[in-house]
Swiss-Prot record:
The family this protein is said to belong to: Belongs to the anelloviridae capsid protein family.
Bias-annotated ranges (Polar residues): 646-656
Compartmental location: Virion
Keywords noted in UniProt: Capsid protein, T=1 icosahedral capsid protein, Virion
Basic and acidic residues compositional bias, start-end: 666-681
Region of interest (Disordered), residue spans: 645-682, 697-717
Name of protein: Capsid protein
Domain of life: Viruses
InterPro entries named among the record's database cross-references: TTvirus_Unk
One CC-aspect GO term: T=1 icosahedral viral capsid
Task of the protein: Self-assembles to form an icosahedral capsid with a T=1 symmetry, about 30 nm in diameter, and consisting of 60 capsid proteins. The capsid encapsulates the genomic DNA. Capsid protein is involved in attachment and entry into the host cell.
Signal peptide: none
Organism name: Torque teno virus 1 (isolate TA278)
Length: 770
């Protein structure tokens, strides 16, 4: 009982020793304590006749010292109102085989049929995005911001709801700048986020049963954000936070149980396509030479795709022999199996030695299924189908190049389909094997080239979106969407091609004598003449322009991304990660008091209205101090002339409904270096060479050189004046923005430039074309 408690309180005496965790260095010398004299005893008689000692309290006197810190106060507006913005959104929706796509880029897509969304996302949240979600009936505001032009941001609470079967990994970022780089999407791969200490796992109900069905995360304001009153227009486009999320697989992190291997297989074009990869019309002669060589190589026809592409052309009677149409049987090799006679074929486009094959029709022993008469069929079929396409499409069709035709062109499934009659028979491609767990990333390169580029080498100017020294399974994650944002081309999947260089494949995708050489991969469906997903319904316009693009290479990136550790293997048709948010704001201002007077005689009932009262929400973009009435604008019952003139400048709303944005607002912006920005501006506004006026202190030789340089200029004076006027207008706009920023700094309404959207900081105002 009590004795046991007292026994537990006793401690054994030990010899003093220095503790290892104690500080051994000398501490700062403390201020000496003030010496006080002896307190005087005061005796006072208590009631009852007994004395008790009483002490007098002395007031401690000392030297007055200044405070180490002062408190800076900001006067708040007269009227303040707390507001919570509560809503529900899908952080990501991942359709079947869309793991490597960015859902934030595809969230507003309307493509159907086909899988929707993506397996990773880079979402950002701003006040404008919250208002846009309110207009879509995806959230509600607990207080109105009408006539309240000031605001304060207090943070947000996020609630992530766990999926029954699929795991997720998220990462919240509040550190500016909130921009995407070439490393952002690879860092969101589950194999990379699993190594990040700031990542949060959201396990499925199957992986971790018995716990709450949601995970709550409290997120504060962004870093370097000063908590004070701002106009709503200033915080309208300021990024509050970014959410990085991806689907993952915690039960089978190193490969799906539905497959028997972790090795990825895909095909790349052989080196014969190196000089004819461009689709420009001036390269047509080179493509024709290569197509004739490929069509003359009879072993390429040992595939079932020959029947699929050329037999309907023969059965329609398009090839005649005299007055009668030829049949498909006339192109079959009828030579019996024998080892007596052989023949040689020159492999097209390379320096390989001639290939020796038997003349028999047994393809398992290097025989040819078709005879030499089939050499002319691909080109004839390509020309006929091209003319038919031109007749159907009319003036909207401008391509007249049969070398890029679907049935018999350079990229026909006859040459590129991986399924041969005998597995050792080679096609116009190379089979590549890739083991993701042997990839160290050293020497890997992933980039895109425009379809007009005439070679497969990496060029610092012409090639774009280079990702190097990363594993292929990480570099392929969200790569197409990053290229679309980086180049500004939303149709880039039809205008560019993907190239890969990697020493960790079998065989190696590199040339030791040419370090910049890349290889063009393509998907299995493209090699078989099908659309992504396996559909045989190829549009007629695409059949006339059949060549590898990012549209046909997306499945290769998908296979590479799913091969990485902890990657989601797309075992379900569609999965989604739901999230609830509660943004905390305070609206403030000095509005004019609005008095509403109603006729009491028309009220026939005393009960309240059954319809719930709706809040009037104003677009934060136009809720600025200049467009709001304040108490100081109201004098003697009337508004002042300056206030009326200021309000007349308010833009009027229109009833014209747009078709929507090209890119969703929630998608993060991409980071552009200063060099890339200067290159883009130099393309839009070329540098102006002024006609130099020779000053009088220069000699005659300098005058002669100046006159010669002026004569060599190709631009006229009027063109130079137009360019100068255009640059002066741009300079005037940026100077006005600069003065506006300086005024905000003087009013203590400035925001850290790293928190502002791209183009809103002071540094971007000085990026004038040279």
């Amino acid at each position: 009982m009590a004795y046991g408690w007292w026994r537990r309180r006793r401690r054994r005496w030990r010899r003093w020793r220095r503790r290892p965790w104690r500080r051994r260095w000398r501490t700062r010398r403390r201020r000496p304590a003030r010496r006080r004299g002896r307190r005087r005893n005061v005796r006072r008689r208590r009631r009852g006749g007994r004395w008790r000692r009483r002490y007098r309290r002395w007031k401690r006197k000392g030297r007055r010292r200044k405070k180490a810190k002062i408190i800076i106060r900001q006067w708040q507006p007269n009227y303040r109102r707390r507001c919570n913005i509560v809503g529900y959104i899908p952080v990501l929706i991942c359709g079947e085989n869309t793991v490597s796509r960015n859902y934030a880029t595809h969230s507003d897509d309307t493509n159907y049929p086909g899988p929707f969304g993506g397996g990773m996302t880079t979402d950002k949240f701003t006040l404008r995005i919250l208002y846009d979600e309110y207009k879509r009936f995806m959230n509600y505001w607990t207080a109105s911001n009408e006539d309240l032009d000031l605001c304060r941001y207090l943070g947000v609470n996020l609630y992530f709801f766990r999926h029954p079967d699929v795991d997720f990994i998220i990462k919240i970022n509040t550190m500016p700048p909130f921009l995407d780089t070439e490393l952002t999407a690879p860092s969101i791969h589950p194999g990379m986020l699993a190594l990040d200490k700031r990542a949060r796992w959201i396990p499925s109900l199957k992986s971790r049963p018995g716990k709450k069905h949601y995970i709550k995360i409290r997120v504060g304001a962004p870093r370097m954000f000063t908590d004070k009153w701002y106009p709503q227009t200033d915080l309208c486009d300021m990024v509050l936070l970014t959410v990085y999320a991806t689907a993952a697989d915690m039960q089978y992190p190193f490969g799906s149980p539905l497959t028997d291997s972790v090795v990825v297989n895909f095909q790349v074009l052989q080196s014969m396509y190196d000089k004819t990869i461009s689709i420009l019309p001036d390269e047509k002669s080179q493509r024709e030479i290569l197509l004739n060589k490929i069509a003359s190589y009879i072993p390429f026809y040992n595939t079932t795709q020959t029947i699929a592409q050329l037999k309907p052309f023969i059965d329609a009677g398009n090839v005649t022999s005299g007055a009668t149409a030829t049949t498909w049987a006339s192109y079959i090799n009828t030579t019996k199996f024998t080892t007596a006679t052989t023949t040689t074929y020159a492999y097209p486009g390379t320096n390989r030695p001639p290939v020796t094959m038997l003349t028999c029709n047994d393809s398992w022993y290097r025989g040819t299924v078709y005879n030499t008469q089939i050499q002319q069929l691909p080109i004839k079929a390509a020309k006929l189908y091209l003319e038919a396409t031109k007749t159907l499409l009319g003036n909207t069709f401008t391509n007249e190049d049969y070398t890029l035709e679907y049935h018999g062109g350079l990229y026909s499934s006859i040459w590129l389909s991986p399924g041969r009659s005998y597995f050792e028979t080679t096609g116009a491609y190379t089979d590549i094997k890739y083991n993701p767990f042997t990839d160290r990333g050293e020497g890997n390169m992933l980039w895109i080239d425009w379809l007009s580029k005439k070679n497969m080498n990496y060029d610092k100017v012409q090639s774009k979106c280079l990702i190097s020294d990363l594993p292929l399974w990480a570099a392929a994650y969200g790569y197409v969407e990053f290229c679309a944002k980086s180049t500004g081309d939303q149709n880039i999947h039809m205008n560019a091609r993907l190239l890969i260089r990697s020493p960790f494949t079998d065989p190696q995708l590199l040339v030791h004598t040419d370090p910049t050489k890349g290889f063009v991969p393509y998907s299995l469906n493209f090699g078989n003449g099908k659309m992504p997903g396996g559909s045989s319904n190829v549009p007629i316009r695409m059949r006339a322009k059949w060549y590898p693009t990012l549209f046909h290479q997306q499945e290769v990136l998908e296979a590479l991304a799913q091969s990485g550790p902890f990657a989601y293997h797309s075992d379900i048709k569609k999965v989604s990660l739901g999230m609830k948010y509660r943004f905390k704001w305070i609206w403030g201002g000095n509005p004019v008091r609005q008095q509403v007077v109603r006729n009491p005689c028309k009220e026939t009932h005393s009960s309240g209205n059954r319809v719930p009262r709706s809040l009037q929400i104003v677009d934060p973009k136009y809720n600025s101090p200049e467009l709001t009435f304040h108490t100081w604008d109201f004098r003697r019952g009337l508004f002042g002339p300056k206030a009326i003139q200021r309000m007349q400048q308010q833009p009027t709303t229109t009833d014209i409904f747009s078709a929507g944005r090209k890119r969703p607002r929630r998608d993060t912006e991409v980071y552009h270096s200063s060099q890339e920005g200067e290159q883009k501006e130099s393309l839009l506004f070329p540098p102006v060479k002024l006609l130099r006026r020779v000053p009088p202190w220069e000699d005659s030789q300098q005058e002669e050189s100046g006159s010669q340089s002026s004569e060599e200029e190709t631009q006229t004076v009027s063109q130079q004046l137009k360019q100068q006027l255009q640059q002066q207008r741009i300079l005037g706009v940026k100077l006005r923005l600069l003065f506006n920023q300086v005024q905000k700094i003087q009013q203590n309404q400035d925001i850290n430039p790293t928190l502002l959207p791209r183009g809103g900081d002071l540094a971007s105002l000085f990026q004038i074309a040279p």
